[in-house]
Amino acid sequence: MLTLKCNAQIKKYIVPASLVFVAGGFEGAMDGLQFHYDKPNQFWNPDISWTNKYRNNDPLQGKTFRGKYLVFTTDGWHLMKFGRNAFTMGAIVTAIGEKRKWWVYIVEGLSYWTINRIGFNLTYKLF
């Protein structure tokens, strides 16, 4: 019976832990692109991809589309940022509504932060 309860407790952390891990991976890719990417790729290289949000890649011609809600479709850095934010919000939403002792939030927060940093370092080192 105790084993069954422990397994149930562990299972409820798998989804949010997986989400923050993937979010960390997206953030690692963001920073890798920003600081270490040197290939001449119009979508992934931030030195040139920032122009993708403008008509004909020319800021003087104005933006490709109105607003900034689709900017994640214009370059790799913003796509990774969108993924990081989406997976982080997913992890937060999975825990809403559960009543816990105050210290459990601290332990969970530190645990998820550690898992997130592992995901970050795995992808950041790819660049």
What is the predicted role of each segment?
Residues 1-11:
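Bacterial Sec-dependent N-terminal signal peptides
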Residues 9-127:
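Catalytic phosphate/metal-binding cores of nucleic-acid and nucleotide-processing enzymes, i.e., regions
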